[in-house]
């Protein structure tokens, strides 16, 4: 059985998505299903110069980093090189928010930097050309198991249902709030007392974007054990087109009400539920989960 040929190319990148994937607990097993043609951080049979001089066969093209026309690396027009292999590849995966929507680097040159097929939410001119083989995996960085899921699905020639931004619905069909260990505090409108606490919700005052950010971070945990909200840090909304926002640790409010509602929830319904929840005082939820200073502890 011929293994699919895999090619990983970078544009303007911090290498974060590559390093995240390297930390997959089954990285070598996953890669054994593919023939790696080139990766900028790994030893491979071909160099970037080889890719430029020889039009090699490519089944799956993984793109990392934001895109800018006429970007030169090692005297090679990287954007032109990427386009040539995008034409040849059977599948294109944009790994990370930068490659998908523009991400952090777009903040530096908003007019000239974008994702490969999307410029924030807008479709670029090349969208129609590549839409039939495009899979978007935004994240800053990408979760390693999201990428392994897509790679193995493609290797087995399985269909991957996608949303309007070509994100796999299996991974992005829910919000980051789904599975959050703080959901009970969210339901009863109990704020956290600060970052790093196990108790309280981070949505109301501390900028958590999990209720309107698509992703499975609280279902498929990082390192199999944790997530931002579990450790007491707000979700930054890194899988969405408009990441990064200007305020990451503060919730924008209008008259004390979060300016942005949870995904699909009308404001009237939210205000009604909030009014009911705040009329009750749940003693258990006002207490510490673990009393570290208690005399009962050993």
What are these regions (language model features)?
Residues 18-20, 74, 103-109, 148-150:
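Short acidic, glycine/serine/threonine-rich loops at helix termini
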Residues 56-87, 93, 97, 103-106:
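Cofactor-cradling patches in redox/metallo enzymes
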Residues 46-50, 78-81, 121-124:
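A generic local structural motif
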Residues 98-99, 142:
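Catalytic metal-binding/acid-base residues of hydrolase active sites
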Residues 1-62, 83-89, 130-136, 149-298:
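Iron-sulfur (Fe-S) cluster-binding modules
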Residues 15-16, 44-47, 69-72, 101-103:
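Short active-site-adjacent helix-start/loop capping segments
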Residues 76-79, 137-141, 145:
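Short, amphipathic alpha-helical segments
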Residues 103-130, 135-139:
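Class I SAM-dependent methyltransferase SAM-binding "motif I" and its flanking Rossmann-like core
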